[in-house]
């Protein structure tokens, strides 16, 4: 079974019909869910996704969604953190949250689903580079 790591922007836009990227997130994620791909996300993505809902006291909606799609939150261990640092070293424009998201996907042998075209290009570059 294929593994799919979610970036924060996908989860946020998927769940917010008013988000400018909602339709894009739905069209990108729904077929992958239908295909039964195993869904993972880094602990840092989970934290990022929860900030606004916790403030608004709507955080249960996020947990219900993640439970419904059987998403696994993956802790960031030392090797993954080091990989994130290496990614930042190779790609100077990469922000730490994005580096952690991509590093978690790589460590989990998963494709990272993101709406960030820059991050997607970096992911493709990393796949092509041995």
Where do the protein language model's features map onto the residues?
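Glycine-rich, Arg-bearing micro-motifs that act as flexible, cationic patches
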Residues: 97
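Short hydrophobic/aromatic-enriched beta-strand-loop microsegments
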Residues: 127-130
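PIN-domain endoribonuclease scaffold, especially VapC-family toxins
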Residues: 2-3, 17, 23-91, 103-113, ...
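Catalytic metal-binding/acid-base residues of hydrolase active sites
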Residues: 11, 118-119
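Asp-based phosphoryl-transfer active-site loop
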Residues: 4-13
């Amino acid at each position: 079974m294929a593994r799919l790591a979610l970036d924060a922007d996908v989860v946020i836009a998927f769940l917010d019909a008013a988000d400018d990227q909602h339709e894009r997130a739905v069209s990108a994620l729904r077929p992958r869910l239908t295909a039964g791909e195993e869904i993972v996300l880094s602990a840092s993505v989970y934290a990022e996704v929860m900030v606004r809902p916790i403030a608004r006291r709507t955080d249960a909606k996020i947990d219900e969604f993640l439970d419904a799609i059987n998403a696994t939150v993956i802790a960031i261990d030392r090797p993954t953190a080091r990989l994130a640092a290496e990614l930042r070293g190779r790609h100077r424009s990469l922000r730490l949250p994005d580096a952690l998201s991509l590093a978690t996907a790589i460590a989990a042998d998963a494709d990272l689903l993101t709406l960030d075209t820059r991050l997607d290009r970096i992911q493709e570059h990393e796949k092509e580079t041995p």
